[in-house]
């Protein structure tokens, strides 16, 4: 009997890439591939790449350099593929810069991987970065029950891809294409199958997830709020999340879902990028800081216990000290539970790359450090406010010490507990007893029997 071929997939960047990597693995499982955690042991290595920042793209070439050396040292015939947004943006240039690469495949062509690999085995080098007319989701197989169980009680489900916003700093519209939404029936079908296989929490993902406008079973276009309501009716699906959102698409129906659906977790990632109206206009965000504050006020009125996270870019071309102070002010006023902050990175082909007033790395680094201080203080305050609170925790994986398990709070915080009799995929009610820099610790009070709800007791609003 022939031994199975081994597959190693490494994901860079966003949750969409994690999801896509899983779907590629599912497709290749049908071709006899089994996953390995060791690239040196693999017959096929896939790097699923991110192009959002220059540093992310350069990581890929560093990884390819390591793979080239390892392949030469071992004398192996490992097939090396580059997928994702770097593949889409750079295409055949990747093979010129890294001749070790056998296959370059863009995000819309993953369902064609088996036929591409057959061509590689015939000695060809393959580049496929087209936007095919067929929907890749119609052709990618669902994960097996064994694969779902191995991935744990949480899962991602893509509901839309692409972006029509054309922020001046961003490559996503060029690498992922226009906004396209899946049909409600396909999303619900995928979610039901995951729940039947033991998944208890689903995160809906998309480049601009709250721009979702899929066809409903009634033939009408449904927004994300109505989709969430439909998914909340799946028996056994205890938690729902979604990411990443744009303020322009935060409509009243979606805000009402936060008010009405206990399964929808009280934690929202809503990138703002800057607190300066002038910079927001230059970024083509098409909203100002006051609109952002209004959205936050509506969300907190609808769901008083909601917590927020965000993304920030510092050092955008032309950003003055006054612009940056506006960003610090917004961060302090909102009080984010968590946030990601980055220095502006020139992305070739975007309008901002042609801007005359690029800032020095020294200025960008200094501003990033100042913003990080504010955001870290806000996160610490939020975490400390959790002391003594009672949360329902979904147990996801073993801890480092015997008997320990690690779960997630409604706010995505890691929570370390000792829970005799409980296992991965179970919910336990926990009193938070300690706050660390990267996780919380808690004392188990009891098991949660009603897994169709997030909590059997209301959470208290927190101020960071």
From Swiss-Prot:
**Stretches assigned to the MTTase N-terminal domain:** 5-122
Named from the GO MF annotations, one term is:
N6-isopentenyladenosine methylthiotransferase activity
Q: Which cofactor does it need?
A: [4Fe-4S] cluster
| Residue ranges constituting the TRAM domain according to the UniProt record | 384-446
Cofactor stoichiometry and binding? Binds 2 [4Fe-4S] clusters. One cluster is coordinated with 3 cysteines and an exchangeable S-adenosyl-L-methionine.
Pfam family of the protein (one): Radical_SAM
Reactions the enzyme catalyzes: N(6)-dimethylallyladenosine(37) in tRNA + (sulfur carrier)-SH + AH2 + 2 S-adenosyl-L-methionine = 2-methylsulfanyl-N(6)-dimethylallyladenosine(37) in tRNA + (sulfur carrier)-H + 5'-deoxyadenosine + L-methionine + A + S-adenosyl-L-homocysteine + 2 H(+)
Domain Radical SAM core residue range list: 149-383
Q: Which SMART domains match?
A: Elp3
Task: State a GO cellular component annotated for this protein.
Answer: cytosol
Name where it mostly resides: cytoplasm
Give the protein family: Belongs to the methylthiotransferase family. MiaB subfamily.
Relate the protein's function as given in its record: Catalyzes the methylthiolation of N6-(dimethylallyl)adenosine (i(6)A), leading to the formation of 2-methylthio-N6-(dimethylallyl)adenosine (ms(2)i(6)A) at position 37 in tRNAs that read codons beginning with uridine.
NCBIfam families assigned to the protein according to its UniProt record, in alphabetical order: miaB-methiolase, MiaB/RimO family radical SAM methylthiotransferase
What quaternary arrangement does the UniProt entry report? Monomer.
Record-linked HAMAP family:
tRNA_metthiotr_MiaB
Identify this protein by name: tRNA-2-methylthio-N(6)-dimethylallyladenosine synthase
- Lineage start: Bacteria, Pseudomonadati, Pseudomonadota, Alphaproteobacteria, Hyphomicrobiales
